[in-house]
């Protein structure tokens, strides 16, 4: 605490005089696992001092922060509201009174400011008054909850004219225990109730045992050789414990707390603590587990955040035992020393080191604590590890905040110094943890975290609805409402939070009653409708038939038929409760009617028909359709009626055995199965008609153990039900043993008697007195699918992870105790293998209506199954703890997905950034299509950055909502640009000429404006759906998700249409311009691939939100695809794009002189000279090189294929004319057609370069004079000295009209306008020969 108490003994006296505190521990378990009268307490896997922030104290699931600034009520409420949505405190129980009495006297300054008149006294609570006609109402804020339990001091509340100005405070005259009224404008101190530190602590169970018992669950009696010890140590003392040589400490129980109004006396009789620290067990385990001796100094300082206000009352109660020492094992990379594992951080950069408070939290997250007083041998290992990392001086925190030191490691030497006074000082940390073992906290049964009872009931509080509204600012108490909603044909009007909405049940002609639905106080969202009062009219009609004593087999048939029809239409909660009630009444009626029948065959037929119909009704109530309606019932009603239904079905099995004439009969349903066997007592063998390991004609699998040759064979029988998925198996003792233990009941009679013979401590042995009764022995088997879920308490972090199986003899409501050496054994198949742990064998206790482990033992277990043995007969199952998200992502899988997401998104972000840079900074790539690429990459880049940085920032509700909105906007914008990818492809195919003005402005307006409108509308209507407690994204359980899904569906559908049109055109047109169509096909492939990637990615993303086992596979697919979007875009549009590659190479060559030419097939042999010739030209002309790549991608450069060199020209024959054969021109014509004037090397249709040289080549032999050749060789030398012939090279401003043909033009139509010779356009200066033909310069 921040300071010592001023009046500890005065508090003690007042406590004795003024109140009686109930001995109810605030940390009691919700499900008791303790045996022999032990008390179950909740313990945390996080050690002490890690739950609350600094300068605060932990109490009942919350942290309380005291502030000395004086404020009026409104300012105090606003101050707390701004502190992570904290609230003012509330006193609603005797435990609260005891806490605040001690806490406030310790915290409120003893010397108030001298200038304050009157001096400040006490703190504000969350309660204030409201004028309500002639009386005052007292309301709790925020939420406007009506206060029902008050704790007024004597003479309170005072009378005021205007109660709107009156608030409730805790003041010193009542020792801060009772309520007093004061004007809200008076200044008082402030205490804020805030949520504890969000450390993923696991809460487990520990047992406080009565005297004489020990073990983790009080399962053993204390003996001297076990060295069992229960020890009490006052908080002002040091704790010590030691074991003999060769033995180590095992901690079974530890709780640091107090008994209010009882000062600690170490020799006094131990009683239950009225308050305790949930971190006690882990703290003591860290200090003592596995050691021969241990010591904890200054207990009050170690457990400084204990909610018990008076240190003089606090004490540590422990129960330890000494066991043979076991060699512990630590994870790889950790230092192992003296039964402890040590992990350490080594950072020389102070910014990466931790403060003392952060270091505590860091160690606590792994269940450990900061090292204290390391011995020399351990220091040597620490020094070695430090020297292996760095040669600099490294500082480590040692001890606790109240007893802190700095360990300095420099080279091979160590030294200690006092901790710096500044709370912002940083150092490295060494964490000490206990090796994992069966005694570790993680191996204990899990429990729900201890919760403030006020918070537990907050969702069901009554809201003030008086005639006059409270005068509270909206910033403190803004009313919230559940929106109008239509569900299952019922319209629920807008309802204020914390209010109950009531509606008549639908279909009033066939259904009677009302349906209610509650608007949750804390979330302002509708809860599940309660249809318990909605019942079809046939239920009442059948109740009347039972009262009229109509034939029970007819009633059961009608119920079965009506129930089936109801499930096919609409089933309500009242139908379930009514049918269970009918089933129980029909069972009693059947006993009465069948017992008076004398005709044996008639009695058997009636009993069989009744049992089949009753079983059919039970099967329908266990169906998946009915399971959703079961969930609408409250937990108490659901468990009560499910337990009754299971009991009725079990009793019906033996009822059939009473009247059957066959020795064996079974009934198989979809959701349950049963078999009943009947045998006469003189028959010593049991089930002899069955063959070993075979399935009989009635569907039962029977495995008979081999019986030795003896007059009375002792054979065990194994039963399973193949008709049920994952059916358990049950192995029973011999028939003769079961017959001797059976306690038969009369065939006729009234209701069953419920006995618990297996609770008798005296087992029935093999030498029991023989049973002389000659009545038939009835043995029933049954297995159920679905009862585990219905009988499970959803609030205790456990689940029934198997089908339910059981057996009974003579009476299903009476259990028979079996000898310890002849138990019944089971093998259960686990329904869920992910996110569960700690299997326990349990049976259903009808008297207590809960699962119990009494008499059952776990034999063996694996991830898929468990084996159990029990010493009694009833219904059994496997109970397991929920250690993760069941059936979804948990543990290592979630961590693996996080790693994959982080690495994949990092690579994707880099690829997207590179793509944006390429499409932005290369001017020759800037066109409409690449603008679409660039913006697509930019939107995905921002979206993935926001995803990585903010997806899990759920601490700040507003910030989380902003992250969700940004993700929604940029992902929608990405898909809009993806739509334009397909649209641009479509426009390229249907337009002959591209319009001169670009539509890029409209593109920007569409892709950035449309998503903004969609997001603005959805966020404005349903802002609360953006961001959840688990992730910063749209709540997938709300209709708002369709604001994202619907546009994506439309965009994907439109793009598919565009791509199909483009594919149809490409496949239907036989174009001579193959290169152009090759370019279109390439773009088509890229667009289709990208569309599939983006579309499939979010399809799997949506499926990931679907609950079930397949969600895991979808999560992996979505994670991988989402993280590789940027990589695919970079590969498709940059790496595999020839034009982009050429631009990048050309850019690189401008800065790197000797960079090799590209080896692309589109350029070699056409655009480059050989390396040898280039070197010769450099020497021959200027002695330096010029770039030889003339690409059509560059609008400023010509494209001149090189066909001749100077060396070739010099070897021509010395004659006046050269005759060129016709074949050469044929080759030349082919060269022209396949020259680099193809579409693949032209960026857009409007990027046609002008003809630099225009020549016409006739297919007749061409005569070229030597003089012209020589003149041409001098005139056409390129800068490197090579002679080139420029054939059909085009120029941007060429005075040539290119002929274009519409899509679908046939080859003949194109060919009719082609000539077998190319047009020759002579340069203006070309002379005309005498024959009328022009001279040509190549």
Curated annotation (Swiss-Prot):
| Tree of life domain | Eukaryota
* Membrane topology, Cytoplasmic segments: 923-930, 981-999, 1062-1085, 1137-1338
GO CC annotations on file:
plasma membrane
Q: Where is the GAIN-B domain?
A: 728-886
- Locations listed in the record: Cell membrane
Where does the C-type lectin domain start and stop, copy by copy? 59-193
Q: How is it modified after translation?
A: Autoproteolytically processed at the GPS region of the GAIN-B domain; this cleavage modulates receptor activity.
What tissue specificity is annotated for this entry?
Pharyngeal primordium.
Give each disulfide bond as a residue pair. 29-40, 52-63, 80-192, 167-184, 209-218, 841-868, 856-870
- Entry's transmembrane regions: 902-922, 931-951, 960-980, 1000-1020, 1041-1061, 1086-1106, 1116-1136
Q: Which GO terms describe its molecular function?
A: carbohydrate binding; endopeptidase activity; G protein-coupled receptor activity
Q: Which residues form the signal peptide?
A: 1-19
**Which is a GO BP term held by this UniProt record?**
cell surface receptor signaling pathway
Question: What positions does the domain EGF-like occupy?
Answer: 25-64, 180-219
Question: Which stretches of sequence are listed as region GPS?
Answer: 841-886
Q: How does it assemble?
A: Heterodimer of 2 chains generated by proteolytic processing; the large extracellular N-terminal fragment and the membrane-bound C-terminal fragment predominantly remain associated and non-covalently linked.
Q: What is this protein called?
A: Latrophilin-like protein LAT-2
Q: What organism is this sequence from? A: Caenorhabditis elegans
Q: Which gene encodes it?
A: lat-2
């Amino acid at each position: 605490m921040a300071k010592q108490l001023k009046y500890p003994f005065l508090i003690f006296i007042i406590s004795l005089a003024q109140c009686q505190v109930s001995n109810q521990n605030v940390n009691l378990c919700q499900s008791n696992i303790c045996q022999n009268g032990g008390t179950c307490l909740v313990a945390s896997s996080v050690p002490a001092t890690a739950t609350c922030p600094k300068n605060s104290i932990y109490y009942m699931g919350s942290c309380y922060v005291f502030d000395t600034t004086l404020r009026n009520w409104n300012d105090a409420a606003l101050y707390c509201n701004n502190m992570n949505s904290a609230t003012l405190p509330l006193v609603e129980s005797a435990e609260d009174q005891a806490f605040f009495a001690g806490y406030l006297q310790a915290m409120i300054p003893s010397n108030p400011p001298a200038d304050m008149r009157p001096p400040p006294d006490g703190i504000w609570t969350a309660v204030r008054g409201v004028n309500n006609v002639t009386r005052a109402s007292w309301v709790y804020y925020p939420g406007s909850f009506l206060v029902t339990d008050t704790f007024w001091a004597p003479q309170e509340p005072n009378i005021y004219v205007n109660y709107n100005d009156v608030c409730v405070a805790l003041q010193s005259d009542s020792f801060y225990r009772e309520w007093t009224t004061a004007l809200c404008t008076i200044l008082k101190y402030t205490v804020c109730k805030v949520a504890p530190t969000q450390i993923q602590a696991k809460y487990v169970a520990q047992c406080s045992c009565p005297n004489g018992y020990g073990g983790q669950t009080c399962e053993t009696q204390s003996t001297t050789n076990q060295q069992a010890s229960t020890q009490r140590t006052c908080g002002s003392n040091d704790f010590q414990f030691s074991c003999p040589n060769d033995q180590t400490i095992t901690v079974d129980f530890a709780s640091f707390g107090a008994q209010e109004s009882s000062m600690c006396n170490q020799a006094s009789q131990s009683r239950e603590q009225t308050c305790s620290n949930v971190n006690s067990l882990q703290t003591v385990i860290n200090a003592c587990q596995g050691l021969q001796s241990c010591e904890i100094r200054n207990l009050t300082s170690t457990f400084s955040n204990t909610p018990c206000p008076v240190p003089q009352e606090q004490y540590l109660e422990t129960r330890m035992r000494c066991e043979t020492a076991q060699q512990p094992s630590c994870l790889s990379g950790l230092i192992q020393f003296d039964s402890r594992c040590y992990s350490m951080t080594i950072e020389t950069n102070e910014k990466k080191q931790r403060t003392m408070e952060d270091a505590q939290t860091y160690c606590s997250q792994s269940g450990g604590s900061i090292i204290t007083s390391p011995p020399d041998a351990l220091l040597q290992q620490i020094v070695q590890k430090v020297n292996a990392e760095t040669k600099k001086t490294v500082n480590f925190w040692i001890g606790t905040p109240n007893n802190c030191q700095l360990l300095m490691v420099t080279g091979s030497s160590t030294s200690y110094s006092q901790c710096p006074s500044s709370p912002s000082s940083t150092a490295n940390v060494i964490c000490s943890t206990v090796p994992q073992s069966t005694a570790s906290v993680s191996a204990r049964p899990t429990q729900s975290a201890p919760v403030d009872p006020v918070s537990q009931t907050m969702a069901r509080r009554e809201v003030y609805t008086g005639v006059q509204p409270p005068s509270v600012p909206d910033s403190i108490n803004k009313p919230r409402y559940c929106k109008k909603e239509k569900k299952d044909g019922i319209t629920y009007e807008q309802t204020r939070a914390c209010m109950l909405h009531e509606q008549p049940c639908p279909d009033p002609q066939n259904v009677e009653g009302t349906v209610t639905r509650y608007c949750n106080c804390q979330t302002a969202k509708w809860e599940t409708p309660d249809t318990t009062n909605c019942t079809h009219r046939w239920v009442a009609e059948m109740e009347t038939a039972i009262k009229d004593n109509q034939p029970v087999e007819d009633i059961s048939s009608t119920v079965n038929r009506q129930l089936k029809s109801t499930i096919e239409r609409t089933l309500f909660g009242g139908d379930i409760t009514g049918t269970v009630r009918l089933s129980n009444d029909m069972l009693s009626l059947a006993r009465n009617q069948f017992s008076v029948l004398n005709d044996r065959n008639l009695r058997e037929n009636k009993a069989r028909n009744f049992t089949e119909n009753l079983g059919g009704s039970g099967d329908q109530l266990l169906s998946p359709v009915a399971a959703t309606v079961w969930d609408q019932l409250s937990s108490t009603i659901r468990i009560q009626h499910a337990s009754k239904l299971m009991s009725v079905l079990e009793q019906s099995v033996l009822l059939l055995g009473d009247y059957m004439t066959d020795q064996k009969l079974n009934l198989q349903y979809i959701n349950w199965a049963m078999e009943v066997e009947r045998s006469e007592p003189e028959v010593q063998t049991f089930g002899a008609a069955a063959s070993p390991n075979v399935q009989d004609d009635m569907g039962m699998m029977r495995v008979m153990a081999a019986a030795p040759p003896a007059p009375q064979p002792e054979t065990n029988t194994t039963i399973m039900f193949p008709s049920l998925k994952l059916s358990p198996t049950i192995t029973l003792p011999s028939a003769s043993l079961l017959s001797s233990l059976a306690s038969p009941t009369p065939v006729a009679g009234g209701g069953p008697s419920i006995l618990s013979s297996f609770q008798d401590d005296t087992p029935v042995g093999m030498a029991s007195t023989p049973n002389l009764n000659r009545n038939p022995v009835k043995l029933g088997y049954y297995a159920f699918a679905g009862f585990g879920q219905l009988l499970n308490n959803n609030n205790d972090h456990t689940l029934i992870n198997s089908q339910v199986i059981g057996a009974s003899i003579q009476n299903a409501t009476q259990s028979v105790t079996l000898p310890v050496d002849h138990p019944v054994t089971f093998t259960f198949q686990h329904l869920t293998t992910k996110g569960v742990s700690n299997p326990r064998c349990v049976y259903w206790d009808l008297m207590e209506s809960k699962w119990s482990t009494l008499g059952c033992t776990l034999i063996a277990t694996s991830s898929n199954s468990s084996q159990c043995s029990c010493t009694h007969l009833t219904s059994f199952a496997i109970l397991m703890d929920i250690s993760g998200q069941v059936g979804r992502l948990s543990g290592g899988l979630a961590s693996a997905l996080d790693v994959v997401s982080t690495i994949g998104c990092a690579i994707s972000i880099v690829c997207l950034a590179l793509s944006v840079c390429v499409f932005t900074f290369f001017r020759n790539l800037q066109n409409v299509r690449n603008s679409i690429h660039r913006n697509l990459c930019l939107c995905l880049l921002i979206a993935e950055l926001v995803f990585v940085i903010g997806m899990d920032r759920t601490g700040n509700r507003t910030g989380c909502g902003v992250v969700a909105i940004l993700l929604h906007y940029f992902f929608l914008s990405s898909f809009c640009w993806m739509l334009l990818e397909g649209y641009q492809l479509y426009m390229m195919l249907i337009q002959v000429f591209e319009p001169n003005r670009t539509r890029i402005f409209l593109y920007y307006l569409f892709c950035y404006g449309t998503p903004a409108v969609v997001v603005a509308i959805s966020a404005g209507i349903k802002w609360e759906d953006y961001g959840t407690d688990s992730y910063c994204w749209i709540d997938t359980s709300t209709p708002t998700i369709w604001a994202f899904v619907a546009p994506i569906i439309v965009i994907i559908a439109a793009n598919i249409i565009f791509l199909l049109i483009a594919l149809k055109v490409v496949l239907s047109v036989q174009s001579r311009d193959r290169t152009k169509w090759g370019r279109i096909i390439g773009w088509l492939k890229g667009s289709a691939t990208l569309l599939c990637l983006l579309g499939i990615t979010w399809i799997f993303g949506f499926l990931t939100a679907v609950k079930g086992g397949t969600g895991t596979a979808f999560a992996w697919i979505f994670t991988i695809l989402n993280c590789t979007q940027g990589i695919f875009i970079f590969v498709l549009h940059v790496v595999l794009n020839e034009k982009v590659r050429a631009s990048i190479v050309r850019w690189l060559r401008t800065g790197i002189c000797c960079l090799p030419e590209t080896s692309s097939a589109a350029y070699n042999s056409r655009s480059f000279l050989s390396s040898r010739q280039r070197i010769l030209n450099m020497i021959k002309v200027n002695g330096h090189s010029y770039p030889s790549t003339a690409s059509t991608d560059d609008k400023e450069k010509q494209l001149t294929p090189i066909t001749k060199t100077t060396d070739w020209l010099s070897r021509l024959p010395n004659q006046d004319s050269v005759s060129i054969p016709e074949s050469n021109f044929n080759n030349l014509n082919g060269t022209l057609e396949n020259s680099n004037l193809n579409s693949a090397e032209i960026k857009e249709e409007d990027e046609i370069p002008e003809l630099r040289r225009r020549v016409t080549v006739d297919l007749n032999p061409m005569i070229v004079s030597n003089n012209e050749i020589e003149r041409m060789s001098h005139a056409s030398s390129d800068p490197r000295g090579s002679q080139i012939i420029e054939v059909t090279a085009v120029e941007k401003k060429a005075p040539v009209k290119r002929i274009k043909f519409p899509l679908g033009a046939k080859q003949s139509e194109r060919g009719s306008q082609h000539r077998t010779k190319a047009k020759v356009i002579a340069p203006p200066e070309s002379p005309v020969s005498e024959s009328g033909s022009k001279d040509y310069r190549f």
